[in-house]
């Protein structure tokens, strides 16, 4: 009886970009099997998977940027039963030796999977936590814009004529904005007309953003109640703090193997310092989940 030869495993590495992904296939001994590139569309993802499986058995893939450009491809790969591993950044030593190119980065991603250097499971982006991330992102931009609006309004009042400043300046932002939003005319000169229009526009922008923030906060409260009700019972943890922690963990928190892994992800784990002293990872202030 004739037996079909058993398919060997191939490993896929992908360097992701906004419009195009570059992929490299290697076998289990590290030889390059093939290289290709596909557009970042649903059809392109299917073509990539079909292309890879046309050579041998595809079970593992290393993808750069699984939280950004590679997110859609990672989800499609997982739906096809491929184990996706996150490639945090290209190996710098290999990049220095071989130069920077998309095929090289894709090859390095595949080799990181083969060598066991890449073992991070990508964050899932398809549930309540991803919804929280979207709301939180919109909320942060609204807070920033609202702060800019009141700062610009106050800056104009500081340099305005004394009589106008005395009438419109109020300590509480709500009172100051309310007065400026009702402005009709401060005078007939070009300066006073421009000042009237600008103050009124900034005040109404602030009020619009305040209303938008109220809606976003309500949505965030509802989402955190559904996804992390127990977390909200902890002292000092409100909807925004809970959302930040949940977004850090992702929709699949089981990917974090220990409490130490979460601390490292938050930038709050100890780092070995000078003379054997340990210090918290305060060198990473951009990590929202690790802020005091």
Residue ranges of predicted features:
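A detector of single, family-specific signature residues
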Residues: 1-292
């Amino acid at each position: 009886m004739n037996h079909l030869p058993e398919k060997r495993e191939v490993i896929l590495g992908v360097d992701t970009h906004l419009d195009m992904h570059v992929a490299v296939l290697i076998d289990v001994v590290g030889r390059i099997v093939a290289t290709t590139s596909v557009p970042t569309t649903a059809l392109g993802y299917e073509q990539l998977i079909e292309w890879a499986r046309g050579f041998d058995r595809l079970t593992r893939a290393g993808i750069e940027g699984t939280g950004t450009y590679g997110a859609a491809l990672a989800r499609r790969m997982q739906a096809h039963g491929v184990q996706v591993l996150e490639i945090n950044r290209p190996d710098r030593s290999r990049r220095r030796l071989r130069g920077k190119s998309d095929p090289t980065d894709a090859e390095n991603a595949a080799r990181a999977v083969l060598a066991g250097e890449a073992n991070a499971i990508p964050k899932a982006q398809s549930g309540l936590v991803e919804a929280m991330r979207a709301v939180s992102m919109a909320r942060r931009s609204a807070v920033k814009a609202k702060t800019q609006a009141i700062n610009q309004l106050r800056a104009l009042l500081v340099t305005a004529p004394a009589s106008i400043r005395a009438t419109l300046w109020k300590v509480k932002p709500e009172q100051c904005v309310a007065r400026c939003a009702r402005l009709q005319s401060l005078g007939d000169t070009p300066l006073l007309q421009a000042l009237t229009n600008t103050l009124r526009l900034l005040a109404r922008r602030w009020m619009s953003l305040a209303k938008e923030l109220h809606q976003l906060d309500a949505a965030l409260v509802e989402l955190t109640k559904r996804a992390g009700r127990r977390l909200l019972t902890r002292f000092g943890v409100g909807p925004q703090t809970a959302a930040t922690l949940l977004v850090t963990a992702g929709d699949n928190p089981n990917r974090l193997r220990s409490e130490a892994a979460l601390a490292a992800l938050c930038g709050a784990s100890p780092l070995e310092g000078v003379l054997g002293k340990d210090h918290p990872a305060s060198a990473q202030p951009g990590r929202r989940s690790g802020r005091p």
